[in-house]
Regions:
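A beta-strand edge to alpha-helix "cap/lid" segment located at domain peripheries
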Residues: 2-34, 39-124
Length: 124
């Protein structure tokens, strides 16, 4: 059972994650830059590796999407590190949905939570 601090952190990090998944928010370079750590790295569902600049640069070319997140779970690693895991379903236009298992490692720096690492693994 999670204590009140863990529940609040789960809500905070889940909200940020869901905002990042929202295609309208994704296109806000300022928001993404503020959420991702300068040394951010992602292993995408495509198998490609991205850094923060790649994510910000790709925003303008990203098609409109609808992505849902479910089964969110938080593991507190330390007072300044937490791992959020969940399942996502992404629909692009009328195309088939892409489902993935996702993990986001966030760290607290200067009192603010920033995503340091993210991995998406396609669900077959």
């Amino acid at each position: 059972m999670k204590d009140a601090g863990e529940v609040n952190l789960l809500l905070q990090l889940s909200q940020l994650e869901k905002q990042l998944l929202n295609s309208a928010t994704e296109r806000s370079a300022d928001f993404v830059t503020s959420l991702l750590s300068p040394d951010f790295q992602e292993f995408g569902t495509s198998g490609l590796v991205y850094v923060r600049a790649d994510i910000v640069d790709a925003l303008a070319d990203e098609p409109a999407t609808t992505t849902s997140a479910e089964d969110l779970d938080l593991r507190v690693i330390s007072s300044d590190a937490a791992l959020l895991t969940y399942k996502s379903t992404k629909a692009v236009g009328g195309a088939a949905s892409v489902r993935a298992l996702r993990s986001s490692l966030s760290v607290r720096r200067d009192g603010e939570w920033r995503m340091l690492f993210h991995q998406g693994t396609r669900i077959a």
